[in-house]
Amino acid sequence: MRNILLTIEYDGTGYFGWQKQPNKKTIQGTIEEAIKKLTGEEVNLIGSGRTDRGVHALNQKANFKTSSKIPTDKFPLALNSVLPGDISIKDAVEAPLDFSARYSARQKTYKYLIYNKKSRPALLRNYAYYYPYQLDVDAMQRACEYFIGEYDFKSFCSADSEAKTTIRRVYNAYLTFENECIAIYITANGFLYNMARIIAGTILDVGAGKLKPMDIPLIIESKDRTKAGKTLPPWGLYLVDVVY
């Protein structure tokens, strides 16, 4: 028996999120079917996190147990030969049998892309949030810095979260530019349900002048979801990296 850790890139547009659901096309379900085609085994693919419908991943991590004789380094090519084009296995390594892509993770990085131009993008419509109004990028950068540290992020968590605690440590948060978009990067030891999208929505409100950067500590302290910005749509969000 081996424990195989995959690094996966996917376009979440056509899927109902990561987690397997009855009669719905999901990332987990699609990859498990591909593994079954190769090995004949029914496996349980454990992802580092359950990305929502429409969310993308550059380096999602997931592990599964197998008795297959396929060499570990051959799994990417073999799986990609049977997977659809919007899912790609980038790497495969053998992990210890007690390793879990979910529970062994120490930190994750997400980014959120905002397309801030007057004209609506056609090619980026499923890959960035369109915001045509003027933004104060310097204020947004200052707002990012207030998120760094260990806090109770209850204000930045959807009400239907099942988390045992809302305390998380944010290691880094910053703003940059890429692919004609504003990119908000957040690295933390874990993310609450919709936390990255709510933080991005709050930073956007700062850029729009609805909030000030120094409002962020007050919003965190309030532990009140209504004080933070809206939850931005899923299609601007990307799982960038997972560290073990």
Swiss-Prot record:
EC number: 5.4.99.12
CDD domains: PseudoU_synth_EcTruA
Reactions listed under catalytic activity: uridine(38/39/40) in tRNA = pseudouridine(38/39/40) in tRNA
Binding, substrate: 110
Top-rank lineage group of the source organism: Bacteria
Alphabetic keyword roster: Isomerase, tRNA processing
Active site: 52
GO molecular function: RNA binding; tRNA pseudouridine(38-40) synthase activity
UniProt xrefs under InterPro entries: PsdUridine_synth_cat_dom_sf, PsdUridine_synth_TruA, PsdUridine_synth_TruA_a/b_dom, PsdUridine_synth_TruA_C, TruA/RsuA/RluB/E/F_N
GO BP annotations, alphabetical order: tRNA pseudouridine synthesis
Free-text function comment from the UniProt entry: Formation of pseudouridine at positions 38, 39 and 40 in the anticodon stem and loop of transfer RNAs.
Family: Belongs to the tRNA pseudouridine synthase TruA family.
Quaternary structure and interacting proteins, as annotated: Homodimer.
Protein name in UniProt: tRNA pseudouridine synthase A
Species in which this protein is naturally found: Caldicellulosiruptor bescii (strain ATCC BAA-1888 / DSM 6725 / KCTC 15123 / Z-1320)
Gene behind this protein: truA
